Amino acid sequence: MLRRSIHTTKILQKPNATSHIWSDFTTRPSSLSIQSSKVKNYLFQKKASLDPPSISRRSNRIKYSPPEHIDEIFRMSYDFLEQRSSKFYELANKTKNPLKKDALLIKAEINNPEVQYNFQFNNKLNNVKDIIDYDVPVYRHLGKQHWESYGQMLLMQRLETLAAIPDTLPTLVPRAEVNIKFPFSTGVNKWIEPGEFLSSNVTSMRPIFKIQEYELVNVEKQLYTVLIVNPDVPDLSNDSFKTALCYGLVNINLTYNDNLIDPRKFHSSNIIADYLPPVPEKNAGKQRFVVWVFRQPLIEDKQGPNMLEIDRKELSRDDFDIRQFTKKYNLTAIGAHIWRSEWDAKVAAVREKYGLPPGRVFSRVRR
């Protein structure tokens, strides 16, 4: 019977002081540590004297028996990875290129069990900065992987299946995760799935956006533009449809963690087109409402942020050309979202609330 022997001389060497990089929190963010003392004590206990806190029932905790020598193997692996992490930190401190430095910092923390625990067992969307801090490169890396594994694919499938691409913009290379909810209308604190049908009552008040950047950006200077457009407004004179601008925001500043675009936070100067809720007309069919998020052009040599100056009087909300708008102001699309709506019994009340005229009623035969 053949046995595989593993040479562990280097691993079992007594580590020096600099190798304890993961356990020294004098300069490290607290988000790189497990916040639960019970979980942390169990993870790093020297003897298997504690019951696993992840098992809720006491009877099951008592029955639990860990694999033989698992604690010794874990400690050996932890010491090895921690020593290797310190080398990546040394390289990162010598590197001036921001992208290369981020890559080294990710390698230094990607195998940290505390980081993996924090990300896997906590809310990634409504993140708490003390647990999942997107200012830290490794959390942005893990967040991007998680988003690309499902959320990004779902978004692109809905945008292409519902023909929001190319009916609004020709294409999208998604770089940031965009989420939207309407908490002020019905009080339902729910993030909307792309392509979901929403009643006119739900969308009757302004939404909240969450824009999660995963790439390295200059958060002090980078500004954003957010547009909501409806490409399904009936255009009877041309026997076609036209695009309406439902909401427009510019010069929005975001950070990796403070990234909620909330009407209670931004100024009126950020609004180029105030919110007009979806009010589909009867028998007009299903209408798509597409959210586009753009990075505004960034001038690195400029001291402050590059503010867009847009003449609101020149905007044609009823016949909005989003392609011309993005080209004129050199905007880069980084994310999108979409929901759908159709006529329902609440539309008349929403129209009255916003001072809009009664909607038309379409029939099979034009009158």
UniProtKB/Swiss-Prot annotation:
Identify the SUPFAM superfamilies for this entry.
PEBP-like
The alphabetized UniProt keywords are: Mitochondrion, Ribonucleoprotein, Ribosomal protein, Transit peptide
A GO molecular function for this record?
A: structural constituent of ribosome
Could you tell me the Gene Ontology terms of the biological process aspect for this record?
mitochondrial cytochrome c oxidase assembly; mitochondrial translation
Subcellular localization: Mitochondrion
Q: List the disulfide bonds.
A: none
One Gene Ontology CC term in the entry? mitochondrial large ribosomal subunit
Which InterPro entries does the record cross-reference, listed alphabetically?
PEBP, PEBP-like_sf, PEBP_euk
Define the transit peptide region by residue numbers: 1-29
Claim: Protease is one of the keywords in the record: no
Task: Report the Gene3D superfamilies cross-referenced here.
Answer: 1.20.58.1180, PEBP-like (3.90.280.10)
Q: Which family does it belong to?
A: Belongs to the phosphatidylethanolamine-binding protein family. Mitochondrion-specific ribosomal protein mL38 subfamily.
Oligomer and partners: Component of the mitochondrial large ribosomal subunit (mt-LSU). Mature yeast 74S mitochondrial ribosomes consist of a small (37S) and a large (54S) subunit. The 37S small subunit contains a 15S ribosomal RNA (15S mt-rRNA) and 34 different proteins. The 54S large subunit contains a 21S rRNA (21S mt-rRNA) and 46 different proteins.
Summarizing the function annotation, the protein's role is: Component of the mitochondrial ribosome (mitoribosome), a dedicated translation machinery responsible for the synthesis of mitochondrial genome-encoded proteins, including at least some of the essential transmembrane subunits of the mitochondrial respiratory chain. The mitoribosomes are attached to the mitochondrial inner membrane and translation products are cotranslationally integrated into the membrane.
Additional comments on file?
Present with 7700 molecules/cell in log phase SD medium.
| Designated name of the protein | Large ribosomal subunit protein mL38
Species whose genome carries this gene: Saccharomyces cerevisiae (strain ATCC 204508 / S288c)
